[in-house]
């Protein structure tokens, strides 16, 4: 069985690292990795540590954590326990919640010189491929799990991805390793367990080389996806605006398939979950192609797709701030609601606002309804609704833009204009905005 150690060493030799972090679950896969790492550390002087994620889902979770610490002590390796809590009432699958929680707590341990080792093997890859096939995935999903991929500030490696579960268990038994068994692994209500117990045994008995065939298909899908993304990168540069929007005119130039892929690439650019095929079609038909006088929006999970001036935008759902108001004290920062940043009225020679005689009457609102103003350089007052349109403010930002008031009169609208009656050189209004990953 030394061929497994040789395979392991060869895998690690392909990639640069200064430190290795093992994700140690206590199962047979990660226990074999622990044994291989301990041997490699002694032979090559690797800097190795382990992290066990305690999900708290099983009554045996504490015992599993203790088992991992004990096994690490036996080989002289540090082991840290990370505790997570899962929102099991969220409606998401427990498998997905646990996976996301694991990656979330592992990420801070991985810097640019760290290689994170995960224990997935060839049978796991077969299951992942079949689950993607069941969902109707394209090349991205059918690429399944990558052997080597960026993670946090460093990279992750799955050195056993081409090794079968049978070979891993044989190695563990030969070397008298001990491991924990998650009792939930026998519950076929979970999709992966159903495949593991009732589907893949039939497939591997009929086609013994199916694991290798699936791995080849996954690699080909990954290659096709990489080529597609390389091609889309140039197209996206042309389609995306400086504000992060997506040009409808550019989308209209391409085929239906190109349009769909550009929309998906746009979501990826903003680090958002991929929209389904149905959702990309709805984005095009219901938002992009809506009538000119419409104000269309499509809500997808925790984001909305909106249209403004012939572009699509990804924005957080609108928050009703119509009832919010607060006094503004000169020289003091005013925290704004819903993560919109801070406001400060700052004394400044050469500013653009005249300070009123009674600054205690200054206040801030987000409600433009019924208000009028006459920007400096203009003649005659206009409704704020019309002024927002003239200044090119998207509809979803109009009730998230601070309005500085004096009694019942508009002094200025942050980052847009000062009313001519309040033009002066005493001070200026500064809006310190929060920087979100999704454009507003």
Swiss-Prot record:
Its EC number is 6.3.4.19. Keywords: ATP-binding, Cytoplasm, Ligase, Nucleotide-binding, tRNA processing. It is found in: Cytoplasm. Pfam families: ATP_bind_3 (PF01171), TilS (PF09179), TilS_C (PF11734). Its main location: cytoplasm. InterPro entries: Lysidine-tRNA-synth_C (IPR012796), Rossmann-like_a/b/a_fold (IPR014729), TilS/TtcA_N (IPR011063), tRNA_Ile_lys_synt (IPR012094), tRNA_Ile_lys_synt_N (IPR012795), tRNA_Ile_lys_synt_subst-bd (IPR015262). It comes from the Bacteria. The keyword tRNA processing applies. ATP binds at residues 25-30. One of its GO terms (biological process) is tRNA modification. SMART domains: TilS_C. GO terms for cellular component: cytoplasm. Gene3D superfamilies: 1.20.59.20, HUPs (3.40.50.620). GO terms for molecular function: ATP binding; tRNA(Ile)-lysidine synthase activity. It catalyses: cytidine(34) in tRNA(Ile2) + L-lysine + ATP = lysidine(34) in tRNA(Ile2) + AMP + diphosphate + H(+). It is an enzyme of class 6 (ligase). NCBIfam families: lysidine_TilS_C, lysidine_TilS_N. Belongs to the tRNA(Ile)-lysidine synthase family. HAMAP family: tRNA_Ile_lys_synt (MF_01161). The N-terminal region contains the highly conserved SGGXDS motif, predicted to be a P-loop motif involved in ATP binding. Ligates lysine onto the cytidine present at position 34 of the AUA codon-specific tRNA(Ile) that contains the anticodon CAU, in an ATP-dependent manner. Cytidine is converted to lysidine, thus changing the amino acid specificity of the tRNA from methionine to isoleucine. This is tRNA(Ile)-lysidine synthase. It comes from Vibrio cholerae serotype O1 (strain ATCC 39541 / Classical Ogawa 395 / O395). The lineage of its organism: Bacteria, Pseudomonadati, Pseudomonadota, Gammaproteobacteria, Vibrionales. The gene is tilS.
């Amino acid at each position: 069985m030394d061929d497994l150690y040789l395979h392991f060493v060869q895998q690690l030799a392909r990639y640069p690292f200064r430190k290795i972090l093992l994700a140690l679950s206590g199962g047979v896969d990660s226990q074999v990795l622990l044994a291989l790492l301990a041997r490699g550390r002694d032979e090559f002087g690797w800097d190795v540590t382990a992290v066990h994620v305690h999900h708290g889902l099983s009554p045996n979770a504490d015992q599993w954590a203790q088992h991992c610490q004990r096994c690490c002590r036996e080989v002289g390796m540090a082991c840290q326990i990370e505790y997570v809590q899962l929102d099991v009432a969220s409606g998401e699958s427990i498998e997905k919640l646990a996976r996301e929680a694991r990656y979330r707590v592992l990420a801070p341990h991985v810097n640019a010189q760290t290689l994170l080792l995960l224990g997935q093997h060839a049978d796991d890859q077969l299951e992942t491929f079949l689950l993607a096939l069941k969902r109707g995935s394209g090349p991205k999903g059918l690429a399944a799990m990558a052997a080597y991929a960026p993670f946090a500030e460093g990279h992750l490696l799955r050195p056993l991805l081409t090794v079968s579960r049978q070979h891993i268990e044989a190695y563990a038994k030969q070397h008298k390793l001990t491991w924990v068994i998650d009792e939930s692994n026998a519950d076929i209500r979970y999709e992966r367990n159903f495949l593991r117990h009732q589907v893949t045994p039939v497939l591997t008995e009929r086609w013994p080389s199916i694991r290798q065939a699936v791995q080849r298909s996954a690699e080909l899908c990954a290659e096709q996806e990489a080529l597609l993304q390389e091609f889309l990168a140039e197209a996206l540069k042309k389609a995306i605006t400086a504000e992060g929007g997506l040009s409808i005119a550019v989308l209209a130039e391409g085929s239906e398939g190109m349009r769909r892929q550009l929309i998906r690439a746009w979501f990826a650019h903003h680090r958002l979950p991929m929209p389904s095929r149905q959702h990309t079609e709805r984005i095009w038909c219901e938002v992009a192609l809506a009538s000119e006088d419409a104000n269309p929006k499509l809500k997808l999970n925790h984001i909305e797709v909106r249209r403004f001036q012939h572009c699509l935008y990804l924005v957080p759902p609108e928050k009703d701030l119509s009832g919010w108001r607060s006094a503004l004290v000169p020289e003091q920062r005013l925290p704004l609601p819903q993560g919109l940043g801070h406001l400060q009225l700052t004394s400044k020679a050469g500013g653009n606002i005249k300070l009123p005689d009674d600054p205690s009457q200054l206040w801030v609102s987000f409600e433009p309804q019924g208000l009028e103003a006459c920007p400096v350089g203009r003649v005659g007052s206009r409704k704020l609704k019309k002024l927002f349109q003239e200044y090119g403010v998207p509809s979803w930002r109009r009730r998230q833009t601070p309005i500085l008031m004096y009694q019942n009169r508009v002094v200025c609208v942050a980052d847009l204009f000062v009313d001519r009656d309040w033009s002066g050189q005493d001070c200026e209004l500064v809006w310190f905005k929060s920087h979100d990953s999704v454009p507003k």
